[in-house]
Amino acid sequence: MPVLAVAGVSACMLAEAAARDGYGVVALDLFGDADTRRASQQWHVIGAAGSLQIDEVRVLDALQQLVRQSGDAVIGWIPGSGFEARPELLEAGARLLPLIGTPADAVRRVRDPVEFFGVLDAHDIAHPSVRIDAPADAEGWLLKDARGTGGWHIRHAASIGDASVANASLYFQRAMPGMSMSATFIANGEHAMLLGINELIVRPMGARPHVYAGCIGPVAVTADLARRVGDAVRVLSAAFGLRGWCSLDFMRDGDSIGVLEVNPRPPASLSLYAQHGLIDAQLRACLQAELPPSMPSASQRVSGNEIVYARRALTLTPLGAQHLAGRADVHDVPVAGARFAAGDPICSLSASGDTAEQVKALLGAARVTLMHTLETPS
């Protein structure tokens, strides 16, 4: 059995997808939840769960251990969430084990706001106004970090006073009204195939106005909108040499779209299309430059997942852990005794239905009942 390493802030989705395709899995992440460990032969911790930050030393130590260990050789590693901010770490890791994904230099370039939005402008692809220097009137502007992830880096520019951009990854972007959306696609360094378009669940968390909390898809859009999104995906894949599963984030306001960024690694939205062949497709796209002719969803129903964040500090009791483990709609299940500060991710929920609105309602109802159970003293 070929062995594959998967890494990220959370490696659960990648670990389950790799196991589904018949790989032995070594998972590297911050949480080590029950689902991840069930799908993996080994688990390595690569950072403190509450920090949501990947520790470079731990990642490289884990990869080095995999190089040295006896038994089946690890064929490579797939970086997931959290690595879009770490091109230097991708380079260092690739020197130890083959990196099966977008190369470090391409990640660096696609996350450079000047180069990224320059490519969009050169191809007349719509996006919200951006600038490197602070606007004279910050009202209606966001301050973003091109190396950030999950929306935790986004702030209202007006709330931080006379902000100055301290490094090249920070930039200002005009807030655009509408629905937060994404396109899930796979690229081979030159061409790309669009898998589906999704709605994103985005919520304010304290001073952070746009924190990622989940996704719903595939959702139906007009043929014209799908064409424009597909054109943007193909232009960016070729311009930056993207490889493997990626996603394009954009805003939709009626018939208008505004491209926001590319996540140059397997996105959370890939879980909406859970089926055999996703990791096989990743390897073929990255190692052989082959794209699948098409990958229809295993179901025509709409799926959704949502991250459940702690509303206050809590410790997961054995009874609470048992409750989570017994629910088929709960994933990324933590172990009993796990402690969470306010704003920490606890687990995730899934639902499916005929429409995005139905799925959204099911997720919301499940979140309310779940939090009531976890916050009620046992």
What kind of region is each of these model predictions?
Residues 242-254, 294:
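A short glycine-rich, hydrophobically flanked beta-strand micro-motif that places a catalytic Asp/Glu
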Residues 281-378:
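Peripheral (often C-terminal) accessory segments that flank ATP-dependent C-N-forming ligase machineries
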Residues 148-151, 263-275, 333, 338:
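Glycine-rich phosphate/pyrophosphate-binding beta-alpha loops
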